[in-house]
């Protein structure tokens, strides 16, 4: 008989060895000095799906960051040099930066404390929601909005459900590796539920429906196996897995900025709403059609508050109302912490990316204020703020979320 301790050690070893290694990977920073150079970078991204662009905008002077595998580094640098693009090596040892995140999280703390000090796993998040529904039954209810491809429960929490209230729908975690987004959603839940008396101005006339993890399969995979996994986990071919959930919504689906290559990080999916995860968002929002006045999707990273359209540089007819809400969030954060957020339409600030959730919510679900908030980055690369940074980021983000919700409450 194999001693139990040996079995445990072998199990731990199996988990450790299953992790994807980023040994030899580097992250490069490139600052385009003109719109033409920014366009060159965009074209490099479009024609090289193996390059993982962590950050890329149209704005000259805004540093792009690219994760590059050892096999691609020489050819990538040749491209940059050929086009006269200046670069620097931002992270020379990507694997080395991941060690703190591969260590087991210390248990024994209460979940409410964990919300702003560590990244909860999906089962812990659902446990937290359930605990709140039991502790505050008159304020909170929890429902299953859907089931992921691998069978995980996708839950929503409804806070302060009252007839006639305008509804705020907030989601996070469409992209697996953006851990700070679910952490921020959880902090918003904590503030609205456990500190409700301090947040009555955004509770008295508003009902909140929050889906803290849209893509639980990818989220768990990014914790257990591949820290920088972005997509869902449903197979999309013989060798590839996953779809970019934020290219999978059925509004101008499959158009500009959405890849047809199944292995690409921006793969649009085999059809619109091919993923059970995006269907869960669709169904939850459509149930609220008419009463939902504010759709907010949390992403990272990059200090942006963005709104439609993502498929064209044209603006919606009612863009000024959306911009007013977005500007309220940006100004509140600036006044509170000094951090500056860029506000504008997705295509004009970043790049065109059709099939996004905010475009769909605005055009199809008819939510009048539809916004994507790109949260601050952290750590060496951007996607990996250390646990010590969570509290600062979620506090700052809540200031902006609360200000936007207050503006919506005043409008509707």
UniProtKB/Swiss-Prot annotation:
Glycans are attached at residues 205, 395. Its EC number is 3.4.17.2. InterPro entries: M14A-like_propep, M14A_act_pep, Peptidase_M14. Keywords: Carboxypeptidase, Disulfide bond, Endoplasmic reticulum, Glycoprotein, Hydrolase, Metal-binding, Metalloprotease, Protease, Signal, Zinc, Zymogen. It catalyses: Preferential release of a C-terminal lysine or arginine amino acid. SUPFAM superfamilies: Protease propeptides/inhibitors (SSF54897), Zn-dependent exopeptidases (SSF53187). Residues 1-18 form the signal peptide. Inhibited by S.tuberosum metallocarboxypeptidase inhibitor. Its cofactor is Zn(2+). The keyword Metal-binding applies. Residues 118-408 form the Peptidase M14 domain. Disulfide bonds join 240-263. Pfam families: Peptidase_M14 (PF00246), Propep_M14 (PF02244). The active site is at residue 374. It comes from the Eukaryota. Residues 19-75 form a propeptide. GO terms for molecular function: metallocarboxypeptidase activity; zinc ion binding. Induction: Up-regulated in the midgut 24 hours after a blood meal. Zn(2+) binds at residues 175, 178, 299. One of its GO terms (cellular component) is extracellular space. Gene3D superfamilies: Metallocarboxypeptidase-like (3.30.70.340), Zn peptidases (3.40.630.10). One of its GO terms (biological process) is proteolysis. Monomer. Interacts with Dengue virus type 2 (DENV2, MY89-88549 strain) envelope protein E. Interacts with Dengue virus envelope protein E type 3, type 2, type 4 and type 1 with decreasing strength. This is Carboxypeptidase B1.
């Amino acid at each position: 008989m194999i001693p139990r301790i040996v079995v445990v050690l072998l199990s731990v070893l199996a988990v450790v060895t299953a992790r994807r290694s980023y040994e030899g990977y580097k992250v490069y920073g490139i600052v385009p000095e003109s719109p033409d150079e920014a366009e060159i970078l965009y074209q490099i991204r479009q024609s090289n799906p193996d390059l993982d662009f962590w950050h890329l905008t149209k704005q000259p002077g805004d540093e792009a960051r690219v994760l590059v595998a050892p096999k691609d580094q020489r050819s990538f640098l040749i491209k940059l040099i050929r086009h006269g693009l200046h670069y620097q090596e931002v992270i020379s040892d990507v694997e080395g930066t991941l060690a703190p995140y591969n260590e087991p999280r210390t248990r024994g703390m209460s979940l409410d404390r964990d919300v702003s000090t560590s990244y909860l796993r999906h089962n812990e998040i659902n446990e937290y929601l359930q605990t709140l529904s039991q502790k505050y039954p008159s304020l909170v209810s929890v429902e299953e909005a859907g089931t992921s491809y691998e069978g995980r429960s996708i839950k929503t929490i409804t806070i302060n459900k009252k007839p006639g209230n305008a509804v705020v729908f907030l989601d996070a975690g469409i992209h697996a590796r953006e851990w700070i987004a679910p952490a921020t959603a959880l902090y918003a839940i904590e503030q609205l539920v456990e500190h409700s008396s301090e947040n009555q101005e955004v509770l008295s006339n508003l009902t909140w429906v929050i889906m803290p993890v849209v893509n639980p399969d990818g989220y768990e995979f990014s914790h257990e196996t591949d820290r920088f996994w972005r997509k869902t986990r449903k197979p999309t071919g013989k060798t590839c897995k996953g779809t970019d959930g934020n290219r999978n919504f059925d509004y101008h689906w499959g158009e500009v900025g959405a890849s047809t290559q199944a292995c690409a990080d921006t793969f649009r999916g085999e059809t619109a709403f091919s993923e059970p995860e995006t269907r869960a968002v669709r169904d939850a929002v459509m149930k609220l059609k008419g009463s939902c006045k504010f759709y907010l999707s949390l992403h990272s990273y990059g200090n942006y508050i963005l709104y439609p359209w993502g498929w064209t540089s044209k603006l919606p007819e009612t863009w000024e109302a959306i911009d007013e809400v977005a500007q309220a969030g940006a100004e509140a954060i600036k006044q509170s912490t000094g951090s500056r957020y860029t506000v504008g339409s997705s295509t004009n600030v970043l790049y065109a990316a059709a099939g996004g959730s905010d475009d769909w919510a605005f055009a199809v679900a008819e939510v009048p204020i539809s916004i994507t908030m790109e949260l601050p980055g952290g750590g060496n690369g951007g996607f990996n703020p250390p646990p010590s940074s969570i509290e600062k980021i979620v506090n700052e983000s809540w200031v902006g979320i609360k200000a936007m919700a207050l503006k919506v409450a005043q409008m509707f």
